[in-house]
Amino acid sequence: MSANRHPVPLDHGEINALLAAQWVAPDALARPRDHWQRRLAVVVPYRDRAQHLRTFIPNLLDYFRIDKLDRNIPLHIHVIEQADELPFNRGRLINAGFALIGDTADYLCLHDVDLLPIWADYAFPLHPSRLCWYGSPNSQQRHLYIGGVTAISSADFRTLNGFSNDYWGWGYEDHDLRLRMIANGLKAEARDGAYRALPHPHNGLTADGGESETGRRNRERIETLHREGFTAWQRDGLNSLAFDHIGSAPLQIEGRSVEQATLHRVRFA
């Protein structure tokens, strides 16, 4: 396995400082002239959140219809449903969505189903961009994270080899993505979007607020990969993805097809 293009520091203080320093401010003037014509695929990893989905889809489509800037973006929503009994795997679902979408999108917005935009900037990203700032968890250390709502060009997603396929259950797949960005020298853009979070269980915590078993397991996994030099991303991601595509169809909300949304059902072996 070849070395990373850019070294990933082993010291936690160093890596936190590097993560904080990598953020850049949005520069609308630097965006390509045709950025409003770039095709956007909103990718929503999903399972067992029917009520959230019924709220999220109309809310997002209404937002794009009303917003004076984002209304011009060619948009399609892809809900990627995990239809098996295995633990939820957000990263693998997003990878599967990217594989199914193919060349129909110029950039992606990786969107949790429980975050509703109040104000946000969904324009084409020059760098992988965290859209959710206000209303996001971990507000005291949010410069370290890129989860929740993330815009990334299809080219950058390929460069990173997508997400890891091996974070089962809650957490740390987005931390892994940030380390992939460091290894490839990609900066992160911080946009100041405001979102409303729908109520949902925090599966990384136990009832008394302690770390859950899945949270501990995934934390230990990324810590091990980090200690080993974090080169595993080169063989774990889009190039190692395996899934069964059960089928795709127009998304149904309240018995009606949603023209700008497709439901893709997949399962993992």
Residue ranges and their predicted role:
Residues M1-A21, F56, D166-G169, H175-A269:
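C-terminal catalytic/acceptor-binding lobe
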Residues R31-Q37, R49, T55-I73:
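Short, acidic, metal-binding catalytic loop of nucleotide-sugar glycosyltransferases
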Residues V44-P45, R54, L69-D84:
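Short beta-strand/loop segment that forms part of the nucleotide-sugar
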